[in-house]
Amino acid sequence: MLNEKQLERYAQVLLWGLDKARKKKFKQNDIVLIRYHLGAFRLSEILEAKILQMGLMPVQRLNPTATMEKNFFELSNNKQLIFIPPGEKELYANLNGAIFLFCPESITHLANIPPIKIGQFTRSRKQLRNILDTRDERGQFGWTLCMLPSDELAKHAGLSLETYSQQIIKACFLNRKDPVAQWQNVYENAHKIKKWLNGLSVSYYHVESNNIDLYVQPGEHRKWIGLSGHNIPSFELFLSPDWRGTKGVFFADQPSYRSGNYVEGVRLEFQRGAAVKIEAKSGQAFIQEQLSMDKGANKVGEFSLTDRRFSKISRFMANTLFDENFGGRHGNCHIALGSSYSDTYQGDPSKLTKERKKELGFNDSALHWDLVNTEKKRVTAHLKSKDQIVIYENGQFSVSP
């Protein structure tokens, strides 16, 4: 577990991340939501005090317990399932920042809930996410999140609680006297790589590993982003491609937990941008149901690469925040099925209308599910000039940060 000094450092890093995640600086009396699991209660207290000292307005929200969540999905009728409490839209429409603290007591309690019910609930909440996305695009909102160790997470990762905790401490630089300075250094180094990537005029990327043969088309007016403060930790660099140009095979060698369901060995075959063949060693019925949630659920919303020189994460953590930032021996490549990120648009995201997003191939969905491959791989950029450049190999980008 984390001691008081480490929690204090975590809070400092989260506030650094929140500041970086905002396009505009916070003003006095801006509203910041802190949403947390019960196990993250102490960190939420530390954050509230710091936010008050900054002259901001903290709003605390405790996540439902595993029992509450299970009862909700088992007992709710259709009307209850999609119910949005009065005041919720008003709160979201006025938020200037949000910090999410994850420390789940269970990650499998929804395993027996029909996937169609989970999908219905997820779609009903998309309207709230759309409010925050719009505010984010306008520079009125920023968010960050983190995870704390729990017995449940450690158990499903196959690690002791101490080993699990140490992975978090090292990944977030909480063992450093000045973790914010370390994050700032990584932030600046990542900027150099993003600048190099965004200087290339790319027709498509070709990803090759033992089990991957995938073509990804970045599309027009795209840029690589990442290490923006949104996730602590975050080492990935990514873009939201033109989903229509995706073809070939992607394989996730890393397992995944989603809505209480365990999925392993996912193999996706893409044709004309859509996953037309979906296979999994475990959880195949669940992933097939999730990928039929809406029209965009079986299409790619994100293409991501993590440089092992940045990330200290070397173990499976049974949590997407850490698993999508896996460093290990070979770094990782992952795709997210579902929603895309408008901030990977090269222009002003606030000018992106729904019609313009569709025209440029930005995918839209209530789903966003990251699937991770940690195999040794090569990623080649095929340039519009017909030249080819290997941009990523052996777990790192082909340029020094």
Regions found by a protein language model. Name each.
Residues 1-247, 389, 399-401:
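Active-site bordering "gate/hinge" segments
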Residues 354-401:
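Extended hydrophobic packing segments that form well-structured cores
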Residues 39-40, 104-106, 150, 212, ...:
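Short, glycine-/Ser/Thr-/acidic-enriched flexible segments
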Residues 240-295:
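Long, well-ordered mid-to-C-terminal structural blocks that present hydrophobic/aromatic surfaces
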Residues 243-244, 259-261, 269, 294-298, ...:
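A structural signal for short secondary-structure junctions
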Residues 275-349:
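Dual-mode signal for accessory low-complexity, basic/Gly-rich regions
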Residues 130, 192-193, 201-203, 234-237, ...:
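Glycine-rich, charged/polar anion/phosphate-binding loops
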Residues 109, 332-334, 362-368:
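Histidine-centered active-site/metal-ligand motif
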